[in-house]
Amino acid sequence: PNRVVAQAVIQNPRITEQEVEKIAAMRTVPNDVLRQIAINRQFARNYSIMLNLARNPRTPIGNVVSILSRLQLRDLLNLTKDRNVSEAVRKQALRLVNARTGGKG
């Protein structure tokens, strides 16, 4: 999708959280749009949106790292095994798993 159009869609006040959830999961969305979703407080309250952003390899790493601390343990474990996300994201997810489980994860 065109970046300008995608950014306009995200800024539309009538967009639903379900629509944003689907956009956050799309791998063709420009990373600027994913960054915009990640820093939006309204969308940050929705766990599914945050999880989709964390799983999306196009989400900027800085945004993903701040999201990881809010994810549940089982989702972090899945991220440590996900070859679609960057190595840095997998390592940070593993650090958080180890911190929460006392190093047993």
Each predicted region: which residue ranges?
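Alpha-helical scaffold segments
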Residues: P1-G105
